[in-house]
């Protein structure tokens, strides 16, 4: 099985972020609003993004070790019809392991994805058509 596939060239606009909804206690939210009103942060989103970045920086060494141990691709990995047809022609299958965004282009038929992708493990976001996601449902971890 082939574990590493080169990142395909961009075929369109890829979203730069994924929306996340969180529930906060009223007191925590009040503290955030106080810091925003005092000019420490531009808005709530700025505070939350800064807090997340600070935590990720604090845990950076542990994250790097896990990424290496689990052989994860860091960032964006896209798969198009041509790439998957080449995998099929070579008689291989892929184990997709991504920390970031894994994207399967809309031109990929579900049967091709099912034949060429052995497993999918994404820490972050996975973008694919509903039909491709359904075809890979039993292989997603």
Indicate residue ranges for each PLM-predicted region:
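Short, basic amphipathic alpha-helical segments that act as recognition/interaction helices
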Residues: 2-13, 30-31, 42-66
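Compositionally biased, non-globular sequence tracts
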Residues: 136-141
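Short helix-capping/hinge SLiMs at alpha-helix to coil transitions
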Residues: 38-39
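Extracellular beta-strand scaffolds
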Residues: 78, 83-85, 102, 108-110, ...
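Detector for repetitive beta-architecture
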Residues: 71, 76, 95, 101, ...
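Short amphipathic alpha-helix starts
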Residues: 17-34
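Short, positively charged interaction helices/loops
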Residues: 57-91
């Amino acid at each position: 099985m082939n574990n590493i596939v080169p990142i395909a060239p961009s075929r369109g606009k890829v979203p730069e972020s994924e929306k996340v909804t969180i529930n906060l206690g009223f007191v925590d939210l009040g503290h955030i609003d106080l810091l925003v009103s005092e000019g420490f942060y531009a808005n709530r989103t700025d505070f939350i993004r800064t807090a997340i970045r600070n935590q990720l920086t604090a845990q950076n060494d542990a994250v790097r070790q896990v990424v290496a141990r689990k052989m994860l691709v860091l960032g964006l990995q896209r798969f198009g019809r041509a790439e998957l047809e080449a995998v099929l022609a070579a008689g291989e299958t892929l184990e997709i392991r991504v920390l970031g965004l894994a994207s399967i282009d809309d031109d990929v038929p579900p049967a091709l994805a099912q034949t060429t992708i052995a497993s999918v493990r994404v820490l972050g976001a996975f973008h694919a058509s509903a039909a491709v996601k359904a075809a890979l449902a039993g292989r997603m971890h």
